[in-house]
């Protein structure tokens, strides 16, 4: 019981790139749209049996967004510079990206020792405490947006994050 029963870490990176352009049926100017997404998911878990009757487990999930330059990924097109793009992505990865979602759950389970006494060896009672925490970042598009107030003055606003937590005790 000196070492954890299980210690785990999993990571995955998912990078997608889409380029959309409307079919030019009318001879007008068509502007392509680019959709880039580079997510980095990390999962952690720990299970530790402190004693035969007392057990602890912890799991956490983190989703981060890796920053990269806007626009088309094409060497030499529209001022795209592969070296600066790589530098920006590597720096973002070194700082573990920008966390968008984080959540963890901790559980403590205790099995009461009624089986140690002859009169109560037929009773089984387990108590479990579970605590949960979730954090969601505001959308990147809403980091700094302007709102025109009743006087016609533009004011910069920032949307907040969402935090939720809960706890459950079961007998």
Regions found by a protein language model. Give the residues of each.
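Extended amphipathic alpha-helical scaffold segments
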Residues: 30, 106-126, 130-141, 156-160
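Extracellular loop and loop/strand-boundary signature of outer-membrane beta-barrel proteins
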Residues: 27-32, 89-97, 149-163
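Residues that define the transmembrane beta-barrel architecture of outer-membrane proteins
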Residues: 36-42, 100-106, 163-171
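Outer-membrane beta-barrel translocator domains and adjoining extracellular loop/strand segments
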Residues: 18-27, 67-77, 136-146
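Transmembrane beta-strands of outer-membrane beta-barrel pores
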Residues: 11-19, 60-66, 129-137
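Residues on the lipid-exposed face of transmembrane beta-strands in outer-membrane beta-barrel proteins
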Residues: 44-48, 106-114, 171
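Short loop/turn motifs that connect adjacent beta-strands in outer-membrane beta-barrel proteins
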Residues: 1-8, 47-58, 112-125
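Solvent-exposed loop segments that connect transmembrane elements
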Residues: 74-88, 141-159
């Amino acid at each position: 019981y000196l070492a954890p029963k299980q210690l785990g870490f999993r990571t995955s990176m998912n990078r997608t790139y889409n380029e959309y352009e409307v079919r030019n049926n009318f001879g007008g100017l068509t502007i392509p749209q680019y959709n880039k997404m580079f997510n980095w998911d990390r999962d952690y878990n720990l299970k530790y049996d402190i004693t035969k009757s007392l057990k602890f487990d912890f799991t956490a999930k983190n989703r981060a967004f890796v920053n990269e330059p806007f626009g088309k990924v094409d060497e030499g097109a529209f001022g795209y510079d592969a070296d600066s793009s790589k530098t920006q992505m590597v720096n973002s990865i070194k700082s573990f990206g920008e966390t968008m979602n984080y959540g963890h759950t901790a559980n403590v389970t205790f099995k009461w020792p009624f089986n140690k006494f002859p009169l109560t060896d037929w009773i089984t009672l387990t108590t479990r405490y579970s605590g949960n925490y979730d954090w969601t970042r505001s959308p990147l598009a809403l980091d700094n947006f302007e709102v025109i107030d009743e006087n016609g003055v533009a004011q910069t606003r920032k949307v907040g994050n969402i935090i939720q937590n809960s706890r459950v005790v079961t007998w």
